[in-house]
């Protein structure tokens, strides 16, 4: 199952990355995100690395120590391109005239939740700790922070940002900010 099912979770978040990059650049008054080519390479690396880390879901099935060491290392390497993305989003914000509109709040919420989820992922990448944390709410929190809430926040940010373009109607600013506050 994890051999084909695991790459899916890394591929599912890629459209969210694109939406967050657009929103952060737009509401920072920038033409493009900081380190555009680094962001492209980071997304490609995340997509490819997702195919070689699948067994980190199977540490408890009796793998030998060398195999666990490989998958621990390979899983931790994913932190590098994701760190590049988070750094680039924050660098895009730096020095910009930030417009504190609702899509930007969703994007900042995404960056925060994705970072917290990434930190929990680094801890879970360690096979020794993962065995201790197996079947706990720590694992549930990790994937909800990264994928569930990450994807939801990216989709909501994209929806609020592009809805006026697609429909010709503007969403009420106060109510959308209240909606963000309730969700966060």
Curated annotation (Swiss-Prot):
<keyword id="KW-1278">Translocase</keyword>
<dbReference type="GO" id="GO:0045277">
    <property type="term" value="C:respiratory chain complex IV"/>
</dbReference>
<keyword id="KW-0349">Heme</keyword>
<feature type="transmembrane region" description="Helical; Name=VI">
    <location>
        <begin position="1"/>
        <end position="27"/>
    </location>
</feature>
<feature type="transmembrane region" description="Helical; Name=XI">
    <location>
        <begin position="173"/>
        <end position="184"/>
    </location>
</feature>
<feature type="binding site">
    <location>
        <position position="56"/>
    </location>
    <ligand>
        <name>Cu cation</name>
    </ligand>
</feature>
<dbReference type="GO" id="GO:0005743">
    <property type="term" value="C:mitochondrial inner membrane"/>
</dbReference>
<comment type="pathway">
    <text>Energy metabolism; oxidative phosphorylation.</text>
</comment>
<feature type="cross-link" description="1'-histidyl-3'-tyrosine (His-Tyr)">
    <location>
        <begin position="6"/>
        <end position="10"/>
    </location>
</feature>
<feature type="transmembrane region" description="Helical; Name=IX">
    <location>
        <begin position="102"/>
        <end position="123"/>
    </location>
</feature>
<dbReference type="InterPro" id="IPR000883">
    <property type="entry name" value="Cyt_C_Oxase_1"/>
</dbReference>
<keyword id="KW-0915">Sodium</keyword>
<comment type="similarity">
    <text>Belongs to the heme-copper respiratory oxidase family.</text>
</comment>
<feature type="binding site">
    <location>
        <position position="10"/>
    </location>
    <ligand>
        <name>O2</name>
    </ligand>
</feature>
<feature type="binding site">
    <location>
        <position position="135"/>
    </location>
    <ligand>
        <name>Mg(2+)</name>
    </ligand>
</feature>
<keyword id="KW-0460">Magnesium</keyword>
<keyword id="KW-0479">Metal-binding</keyword>
<feature type="binding site">
    <location>
        <position position="6"/>
    </location>
    <ligand>
        <name>Cu cation</name>
    </ligand>
</feature>
<feature type="transmembrane region" description="Helical; Name=VII">
    <location>
        <begin position="36"/>
        <end position="52"/>
    </location>
</feature>
<dbReference type="Pfam" id="PF00115">
    <property type="entry name" value="COX1"/>
</dbReference>
<dbReference type="GO" id="GO:0015990">
    <property type="term" value="P:electron transport coupled proton transport"/>
</dbReference>
<feature type="binding site">
    <location>
        <position position="134"/>
    </location>
    <ligand>
        <name>Mg(2+)</name>
    </ligand>
</feature>
<feature type="binding site" description="axial binding residue">
    <location>
        <position position="144"/>
    </location>
    <ligand>
        <name>Fe(II)-heme a</name>
    </ligand>
</feature>
<keyword id="KW-0472">Membrane</keyword>
<dbReference type="GO" id="GO:0046872">
    <property type="term" value="F:metal ion binding"/>
</dbReference>
<dbReference type="GO" id="GO:0020037">
    <property type="term" value="F:heme binding"/>
</dbReference>
<keyword id="KW-0186">Copper</keyword>
<feature type="topological domain" description="Mitochondrial matrix">
    <location>
        <begin position="94"/>
        <end position="101"/>
    </location>
</feature>
<dbReference type="InterPro" id="IPR023616">
    <property type="entry name" value="Cyt_c_oxase-like_su1_dom"/>
</dbReference>
<keyword id="KW-0496">Mitochondrion</keyword>
<dbReference type="GO" id="GO:0004129">
    <property type="term" value="F:cytochrome-c oxidase activity"/>
</dbReference>
<dbReference type="InterPro" id="IPR023615">
    <property type="entry name" value="Cyt_c_Oxase_su1_BS"/>
</dbReference>
<feature type="topological domain" description="Mitochondrial matrix">
    <location>
        <begin position="28"/>
        <end position="35"/>
    </location>
</feature>
<keyword id="KW-0679">Respiratory chain</keyword>
<protein>
    <recommendedName>
        <fullName>Cytochrome c oxidase subunit 1</fullName>
        <ecNumber>7.1.1.9</ecNumber>
    </recommendedName>
</protein>
<feature type="topological domain" description="Mitochondrial intermembrane">
    <location>
        <begin position="124"/>
        <end position="136"/>
    </location>
</feature>
<dbReference type="GO" id="GO:0006123">
    <property type="term" value="P:mitochondrial electron transport, cytochrome c to oxygen"/>
</dbReference>
<keyword id="KW-0999">Mitochondrion inner membrane</keyword>
<feature type="transmembrane region" description="Helical; Name=X">
    <location>
        <begin position="137"/>
        <end position="166"/>
    </location>
</feature>
<keyword id="KW-0813">Transport</keyword>
<feature type="transmembrane region" description="Helical; Name=VIII">
    <location>
        <begin position="65"/>
        <end position="93"/>
    </location>
</feature>
<keyword id="KW-0408">Iron</keyword>
